[in-house]
A protein has these predicted regions:
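Short, conserved aromatic-histidine micro-motifs
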Residues: 83-103
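Solvent-exposed alpha-helices and their adjacent loops that cap or buttress functional pockets
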Residues: 20-22, 90-92, 112-114
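Short secondary-structure boundary segments
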Residues: 32, 78, 104
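Short, small-residue-biased leader/transition segments that mark boundaries at the very start
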Residues: 3-5
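Helix-adjacent hinge/juxtasegments
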Residues: 10-51
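C-terminal helix-cap and adjacent tail motif
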Residues: 98-126
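Small-aliphatic-rich amphipathic alpha-helix that forms the alpha element of a beta-alpha
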Residues: 28, 43-87
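Short coil/turn connectors at secondary-structure junctions
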Residues: 22-26, 71, 92-96
Length: 126
């Protein structure tokens, strides 16, 4: 599940070394819910942890939607989980996995240096 925080005090708490994120007007907290029995059994049979796959898909869509609206985003995984859970009322039995910050970028994006396609894509064989 996701939780949106727009209180700058709560948003900045527990961010530790991510000081830049305190200026973001919106923080979307990604919270892991317990699996239902079908997902649990499927995960055991397939040896895959489906909640993390689902969280990855949801996070990608959130950041892509922000980008399509001209907003910037940053996915944070390094924060004080206990502190943020205490301030936001997230139950102790839930896991806070990510903080996705959303806002208007302070400056234009720099051109990124990317590896060539042949270095990251393979066909028919790894």
């Amino acid at each position: 599940s996701e939780m949106c925080i727009r209180d700058s005090g709560k948003a900045a708490a527990g961010l530790g070394m991510n000081k830049f994120a305190k200026d973001a007007p919106v923080h979307i907290l990604v919270v892991e819910e317990s699996m239902n029995i079908t997902s649990f059994l499927g995960a055991k049979i397939k040896d895959k942890y489906f909640p993390l796959i689902d969280i990855g898909i949801a996070t990608a869509h959130i950041t892509l939607a922000a980008e399509s609206e001209g907003l910037g985003s940053c996915i944070l995984g390094w924060f004080d989980e206990k502190e943020i859970k205490k301030l936001t009322g997230i139950p102790a039995n839930k896991r806070l996995l990510l903080d996705i910050t959303i806002g208007y970028p302070a400056k234009d994006k720099r051109k990124k240096s990317r590896k060539s396609k042949d270095k990251v894509v393979s066909y028919n064989h790894y």
